[in-house]
């Protein structure tokens, strides 16, 4: 009889344990990272400055790639630092993917610029694309900060 009561008690405790565990939230994404947020925001400012400068230089000799190599070097360094940071954070795959895509976009921008000066129309489209990519990264970080679901 006591063995039966002991088994019933164990089953009850197991059931309570399972119910408690099922009520726990499973975290599948990293927490908000203020340094990533700040670094991405700083990069966005640098990108905007670059696009405004290149747009103002359209048709002038100053628009050439060779006059903007320092920007590309600094942007690559900034993105590399951001990439290293986001890869060091556990459960941060979405942010890693977005930063990788942003790095690819920067490489493509540089290759396009090496072919010749960017036209005002190209600058408008490129700036919009970079703003969208950066906004997506910031939205994800801010959603992490609020603890809200991403969907």
Predicted region positions:
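C-terminal motif of bacterial Sec signal peptides marking the signal peptidase cleavage site
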Residues: 19-23
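C-terminal amphipathic alpha-helix
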Residues: 105-151
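Alpha-helical segments in soluble extracytoplasmic regions
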Residues: 52-91
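Bacterial N-terminal signal peptides that target proteins for export
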Residues: 1-13
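Heptad-repeat alpha-helical coiled-coil/4-helix-bundle sensor or tether segments in soluble regions
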Residues: 86-113
């Amino acid at each position: 009889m006591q063995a039966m009561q002991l088994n019933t008690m164990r089953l009850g405790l197991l059931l309570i344990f399972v119910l408690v565990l099922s009520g726990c939230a499973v975290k599948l994404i990293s927490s908000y990272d203020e340094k990533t947020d700040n670094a991405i925001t700083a990069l966005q400012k640098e990108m905007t400055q670059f696009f405004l400068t290149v747009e103002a230089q359209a048709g002038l000799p100053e628009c050439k790639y060779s006059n903007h190599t320092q920007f590309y070097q600094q942007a690559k360094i900034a993105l590399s630092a951001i990439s290293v940071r986001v890869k060091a954070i556990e459960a941060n795959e979405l942010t890693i993917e977005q930063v990788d895509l942003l790095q690819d976009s920067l490489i493509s921008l540089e290759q396009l610029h090496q072919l010749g000066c960017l036209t005002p129309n190209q600058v408008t489209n490129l700036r919009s694309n970079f703003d969208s990519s950066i906004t997506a990264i910031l939205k994800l970080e801010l959603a992490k900060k609020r603890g809200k679901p991403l969907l």
